[in-house]
Amino acid sequence: MWFGGGPIDAAGALRGFVREAGGCAVVDGGLGTELEAHGADLHDALWSAKCLASAPHLIRKVHLDYLEAGADVIISASYQATIEGFQSRGFSRDESEELLRRSVHVAQEARRVFAAEGDRSSRRGRPPALVAASVGSYGAYRADGSEYSGDYGKSMTKEDLKNFHRRRLQVLAGAGPDLIAFETIPNKLEAQVYAELLEENGIRIPAWFSFTSKDGVNAASGDPINECAAVADSCPRVDAVGVNCTAPRFIHGLILSIKKVTSKPIVVYPNSGETYVAETNEWVDSDGATGTDDFVSRVGEWRRAGAALIGGCCRTSPATVRAIARAVREAEYDDIPAVAVL
């Protein structure tokens, strides 16, 4: 691995990886819809994490698909994986923790298989891909759509959230990922919780904080995106900050807002532009929804605005990531701001 065989304690580690990747690293795409395409039944509160117990080979297949497509970073199937969630399905605490570790190990196994057997022509001159351990929000565990609103109720406190995330974070970090991706963060409070847990637990693995937005100005909760990004900027354990699971049409403006409060690399991996309806567990077309061609046509704009890591989230596919990788690697970026590359 580029990170020397395991996690390292070095400020700017992810920035260095981006530089080695040519100035812009490619993040993978959606997991759940790809698992369904391979035959997985995800009608469950655990969502894609269900496959950690029932079909880890399908998760490995999806990781391999993204590596073949040119991803520089693959994200573990732990977004919806929690100790409490697994226990509610009858697993013991020890079994639940082992399933969390498995999410990282399956991704690492896919990387090993790709290195030994895959078509590595797309990686010529690029560092080996990184494995990011995904940490989803408390709302993702609730599986009621509240990760898209940030509304956890007035009784939810910072200590409550710390107690929910602490052991899960410790287990995932102990599995040896290259970095930790705190994803689809809907509010400033949860970002503060993550930052404090990283410090309090002495976790030395580089991390990124990625928020979600419904309006291109604020996080899902209504907290201003610049205030949320400032939390990430103030945490020395956080190497990058950005947005995910957000409509592509909002990404450019969000990058510009985030740049005002941080010089850290910016990561963006939007969804397809469709809207998730929690009541029916469906994604529906909405204004601004884009196909792969239109989605990828925005990559240059995002890159010029300052994005240093670009990928896709819900409803994107290996085809999307392949097109992103092609756009990133073929385009000329003479006017890219130095902060995104150095």
Curated annotation (Swiss-Prot):
The keyword Secreted does not apply. Pfam families: S-methyl_trans (PF02574). GO terms for biological process: methionine biosynthetic process; methylation. Disulfide bonds: none annotated. Zn(2+) binds at residues 245, 313-314. Catalyzes methyl transfer from S-methylmethionine (SMM) to adenosyl-L-homocysteine (AdoMet). SMM degradation (by HMT-1, HMT-2, HMT-3 and HMT-4) and biosynthesis (by MMT1) constitute the SMM cycle in plants, which is probably required to achieve short term control of AdoMet level. Monomer. It comes from Zea mays. This is Homocysteine S-methyltransferase 4. Keywords: Amino-acid biosynthesis, Metal-binding, Methionine biosynthesis, Methyltransferase, S-adenosyl-L-methionine, Transferase, Zinc. Its cofactor is Zn(2+). It comes from the Eukaryota. PANTHER family: HOMOCYSTEINE S-METHYLTRANSFERASE 3, ZGC:172121. It catalyses: S-methyl-L-methionine + L-homocysteine = 2 L-methionine + H(+). One of its GO terms (molecular function) is S-methylmethionine-homocysteine S-methyltransferase activity. Residues 13-328 form the Hcy-binding domain. Its EC number is 2.1.1.10. It is an enzyme of class 2 (transferase).
